[in-house]
Regions:
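Signal peptide-proximal N-terminal region
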Residues: 47-48, 54-86
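Bacterial N-terminal signal peptides that target proteins for export
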Residues: 2-12
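Extracellular/periplasmic ligand-binding modules, especially the Venus flytrap/periplasmic-binding
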Residues: 64, 281-312
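Bacterial N-terminal signal peptides
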Residues: 12-21
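Short beta-strand elements in bilobed, periplasmic/extracellular small-molecule ligand-binding domains
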Residues: 73-91, 147-149, 198-220
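Extracytoplasmic ligand/sensor domains, especially the bilobed periplasmic-binding protein
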Residues: 107-208, 269
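Short, well-structured alpha-helical segments in soluble
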Residues: 88-107, 167, 220-238
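Extracellular/periplasmic bilobed ligand-binding domains
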Residues: 123-131, 175, 184-288
Length: 312
């Protein structure tokens, strides 16, 4: 459930002030330029299991190009113009890049990064800019990590787990075998699924933690070993309607579909996943939007594209 404050308070007030103040002075023609930046922070992490899952070098940026073009269409009638700078950064480069952009008058930042990157960006911006979180689903960013200048486009783990729980219960797949990873973000996601299960009347008939011990999963021998281990890992669990995987780190979930000891559907971080965008979306102009993304980038739209476009 979403909770809203009784009054807009400083968050909305600050946002309205920034929206009313363009990043450059109005010229005599009353033409106004609005400048934004989309920063993707590429933190180090494990390689995906499949090369098909490797992100494109410009991942997310097609949404920025499309969003800026859409703004310009309406802006032309309002004597407004829009510029958006896109950049992929290492985590240590975020601070100097933001200071440069803030110094140039940029007041809107769309951040594609983990919760640490989003928090750092919001703290750096202070009252000088509004930050849009277009990627991190961390519940803590919406609770104790909330900032007055931070707006969320990406849904939270709580929202996504609620969506999945509602569907599974509707399908009467209400008995779950929950497998969560050993990383802190995996444990947080597992907690979100437990809350969702209690909220919507599902039961956790079995729980297990998958310990990340590293290993050569992308070599031939590593692949064979992983394929043999997954069924055994899921063996002996109490009867369940499906497996729910909590694997933010991307260590094990992709191996679960069709590899469980008992033939059961897999949901969560693999298999049936709660997402903000899917190629099957057709209503509300979705087909036209996806066709435009494909024409622009040569690839199918992703959640990152959609969330960046929404932010702008």
């Amino acid at each position: 459930m979403l909770r809203f404050p009784k009054s807009p308070g400083p968050l909305l007030a600050a946002s309205f002030v920034l929206m009313a103040a363009p990043s450059v002075s109005q010229a005599q023609s009353d033409s106004v330029l609005y400048r934004a930046a989309v920063l993707r922070i590429d933190a180090p992490g494990p390689m995906p299991i499949s090369r098909l899952s490797l992100p494109a070098e410009d991942a997310g940026f097609a949404g920025a190009t499309l969003g800026t073009a859409d703004n310009a269409t309406t802006g032309a009638f309002m004597k407004q113009s829009f510029e958006t700078e896109t950049k992929a950064l290492a985590p240590e480069a975020l601070a100097p890049e933001m200071e440069r952009l803030l110094g140039e008058g940029v007041q809107w930042f769309v951040i594609l990064g983990d919760s640490a990157a989003v928090s750092q960006a919001a703290d750096l911006a202070g009252d000088r800019a509004v930050i849009f979180n277009a990627l991190s689903t961390d519940d803590a960013l919406r609770a104790e990590g909330c900032r007055a200048n931070l707006l969320h486009i990406a849904p939270s783990d709580a929202m996504l787990s609620d969506a999945l729980a509602q569907y599974l219960v509707w399908k009467r797949w209400s008995d779950w075998f929950l497998i969560e990873g050993s990383h802190p973000q995996d444990r947080a996601l597992g907690a979100a699924y437990r809350r969702a299960a209690e909220k919507f009347g599902a039961r956790l008939t079995a729980e297990k933690v998958f310990e990340d011990t590293g290993g050569a999963r992308r070599t031939d021998s590593g692949h064979v070993q992983a394929q043999a281990q997954r069924p055994v890992f899921t063996q002996g669990a109490a009867n369940q309607h499906g497996v729910v995987a909590a694997d933010h780190a991307g260590v094990f979930a992709d191996w679960l579909p069709y590899h469980t000891w008992d033939a059961r559907p897999v949901a969560g971080s693999a298999g049936l996943r709660p997402v903000t965008w899917h190629p099957a979306h057709e209503a509300g102009g979705a087909m036209q939007w996806q066709a435009r993304v494909e024409k622009l980038s040569g690839r199918q739209a992703t959640e990152a594209y959609f969330q960046v476009w929404t932010a702008l």
